[in-house]
Amino acid sequence: MTLNRIMKWLLFAAVIAGLLVCAFFVFRFNQPKPTTNIHYADTQNKQQTLDMYMPKGKDEDKKKHPVMIYLHGGGWTGGDKNRVASKADYFTGQGYVFVSMNYRLHPDANYGQMADDTANAIKWVKDHADEYQIDSSKINVMGHSAGGHLTALVATDSTYLKRVGLSPKTINSIVILDGPLNINQFIQAIPSYKKVFGKQEENWTKASPVTYMNQKNVPPVYLVTGWENPEVYRFAEKLNHEKGSNFVFRVHSLSHSDLNKWFGSDRAPKEAQEMTKAVMAFVKKQNQ
């Protein structure tokens, strides 16, 4: 290869690199900027904070928006509210306020205290709805993995919301991204999680959202699952009072982490895009 051709290739590579850098900064610039580390409980614990992402143009339109509160996964021992991938951009682009919350983690908290944190965050959002142009009648909650479990538990076991003066009717809809609903079944499959839920089966039953799926006033649910579990369909049927399969999206090509990572991304694989569309169709219907 001649020196002239080498120089041309180097120039071409430099141009491509420059375009990629520009694209990165444009992407970052267009991301919604959150108000971060808002304390939703009467403590200074950084695990009891949330980030608030507002729809673009919200100051101009002055109208109130539905809200999606998101709980991260992490096996009840890890994870963080700043790991939202494309969700904040996606939901704010759909006209929703997006809230990503932290909750206390094991070993500093048990699952019940995590559920209390979830209820406290929901109450904070409801109490501050006017301040952030939120329609308090359209509070939706979504969780992935452990966050999905906590979302389902708070929505079905009224104990947690009652402690903060609310009821499950406060929640307009919930979305569960591959979160465990039956902790007995879950621990039998992965015994190491006894460290989180204890060794007594009665505690596992108490921590299981399926235990409460026959309760009144539970919100409608949409579930994304990576495996064929009849209990998922029963849970969907009980909460929606319709055929369960209408409210379950079964992924086949996406892993447990990928279905969360790709949610809302316009660069996602086809199945992930279909998943996002199905979830959003459900959410929009509940927020009409």
Indicate residue ranges for each PLM-predicted region.
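N-terminal cap/lid segment of alpha/beta-hydrolase-fold proteins
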Residues: 24-62
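Short beta-strand element of the alpha/beta-hydrolase
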Residues: 62-74
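Structural cue for short, hydrophobic secondary-structure segments
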Residues: 70-73, 100, 124
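Short amphipathic alpha-helix adjacent to the substrate-entry channel of hydrolases
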Residues: 82-99
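Alpha/beta-hydrolase active-site loop
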Residues: 109-130
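Primarily recognizes the serine-hydrolase "nucleophile elbow" in alpha/beta-hydrolase
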Residues: 123-188, 204
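The feature captures the conserved acid-bearing segment of alpha/beta-hydrolase catalytic domains
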Residues: 166-168, 173-187, 201-234
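C-terminal catalytic histidine-bearing segment of alpha/beta-hydrolase fold enzymes
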Residues: 224-227, 244-288
